[in-house]
């Protein structure tokens, strides 16, 4: 990058990350420019949250148009644009309905709550489990952290939320073994959390063979 070492943050900003001493001032598409005018190819994309690129003309105009009308009214009221987007998304996917969230962690947290709700209802409150993959990453809330198959991220935040067991990614035999163990112990599997592509785990792809085998 041409920069050495980390950048100290302002004392008023909570220190959570070691940051590069780079401050970006503008972006266009997949490109960024720092305060010195140096150009960078942005392969990080806000940790995969800016997939449309920076300063996208269509997105920018849509946001400005909406901000001039209504900024936020919550789910207490009918939101026509939200309903239209949900219809579009269900047409393009296998989903029958959608639940809009602000982040991946919130989406996974909601998924975990839905699985737990289903498990407690279906299994009459009996011990039910959620299976997740080793080397996975599902977020930094306490529940998603508990579902993350990497102890290094859980260190210092114990105890984790109970009810998770982990299998080897792309290993259907490992999954079947967990199911057998749960059945033997009188436990029920209420759901499975899995990433089609593991990012934190090393950009690992979930193979079609594993999917065809039943997961």
Q: What is the role of each PLM region?
A:
Residues 5-6:
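Short, positively charged low-complexity motifs
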Residues 9-97, 208:
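N-terminal glycine-rich, Lys/His-bearing helix-loop that initiates the first secondary-structure elements
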Residues 46, 69-70, 172, 196-200:
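A short, flexible beta-alpha/helix-coil linker loop
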Residues 56, 134, 193-196:
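Short, small-residue-rich loop/turn micro-motifs
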Residues 67, 156-160, 196-198:
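Gly-rich Lys/Arg/Thr-decorated short loops/hinges at beta-loop-alpha junctions or inter-strand turns
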Residues 86-191:
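PLP-dependent aspartate aminotransferase-fold enzymes
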Residues 186-202:
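Short acidic, glycine-rich surface-loop motifs adjacent to enzyme active sites
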Residues 206-215:
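Single conserved hydrophobic/aromatic residue that forms the stacking wall/gate
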């Amino acid at each position: 990058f041409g920069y050495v070492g980390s950048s100290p943050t302002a004392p008023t900003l909570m220190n959570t990350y070691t940051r590069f001493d780079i401050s970006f001032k503008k972006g266009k598409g997949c490109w960024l420019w720092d305060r010195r005018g140096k150009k960078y190819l942005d392969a990080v994309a806000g940790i995969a949250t800016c997939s449309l690129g920076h300063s996208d003309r269509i997105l920018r105009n849509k946001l400005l148009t909406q901000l001039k009308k209504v900024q936020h009214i919550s789910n207490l009221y009918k939101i026509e644009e939200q309903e239209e987007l949900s219809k579009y998304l269900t047409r393009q996917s296998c989903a029958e309905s959608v639940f809009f969230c602000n982040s991946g962690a919130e989406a996974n947290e909601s998924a975990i709550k839905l699985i737990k709700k289903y498990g407690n209802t279906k299994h009459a409150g009996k011990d039910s489990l959620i299976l997740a993959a080793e080397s996975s990453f599902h977020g930094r809330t306490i529940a998603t952290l508990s579902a993350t198959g990497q102890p290094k991220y859980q260190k210092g935040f114990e105890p984790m939320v109970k009810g998770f067991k982990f299998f080897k990614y792309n290993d259907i035999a490992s999954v079947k073994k967990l199911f057998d163990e749960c059945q033997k112990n009188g436990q029920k599997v209420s759901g499975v959390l899995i990433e089609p592509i593991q990012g934190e785990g090393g950009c690992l792809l979930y193979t079609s063979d594993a999917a065809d085998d039943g997961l």
